[in-house]
Amino acid sequence: AVKRHRKSVKKSYVYLSGWMVAALRSEFGPLPDQSMHEKTSVPALIEEIYTFLKQADARELRHLFVDLDEARANGGDVDAALAAIDNFETHVVPIIADIDAGFGNEEATYLLAKKMIEAGACCIQIENQVSDAKQCGHQDGKVTVPHEDFLSKINAVRYAFLELGVENGVIVARTDSLGAGLTQKVPVSQAPGDLADQYNSFLKTESVTDAAKVGHGETTLVRDGEIVKPVRLPNGLYAFKEGSGEDRVVLDCITSLQNGADLLWIETEKPN
């Protein structure tokens, strides 16, 4: 339709978003954007679209070759027919696939990314939410993972591209930190100022002046020589400091680009 309307598909692409696939392509019926649809739904749709675009090419090229045969048989303009074939513009456009938060750990992310690439995707978008607690980007209650977890998934997607011989595959790293006030776990810092330490600096904490008052099973950290206790919710999640979202986004973007991402997606905290 785009090619017929614009006479060209240049600068066009197909984007398969997770919310669209969840709403329209799940065997469970319409679902919210929470990674509850089958993980193979996206690769299946990629293959369907890619096959359809190639079939559109085959159909139009058949007509062009028929025109060439007729020109040769009837003394027509063979050069014009050949030029039409040589200048034919394919219907196939880049396919960008949303892998959500990877549908599992880094190995699961790698396997699913391979399926998407084999089906025809040249670009994969991945986000830093917790896979089994994923929310729609504009909803409250989002939970992010530490950088080490997210970067391992970016690497997993890159390995999938490289294993399939795709040297120029594109990875879009999406950060949901702007609207996320929670994290699933406290990463282990090996040295002051390392990535885990920077991540932990955004945690909402309470000062501990008396170690005897630390409750059973509670977590404590040492920050700048002071013992602090991260604020933990009854569900086990840890809270970030209020107003720290933008700073967390900046750190997310820098670390993603340093570790293999090609493009950045900063998800807004509300649909504005």
Q: Where are each of the predicted segments found?
A:
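Alpha/beta enzyme core
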Residues: 1-272
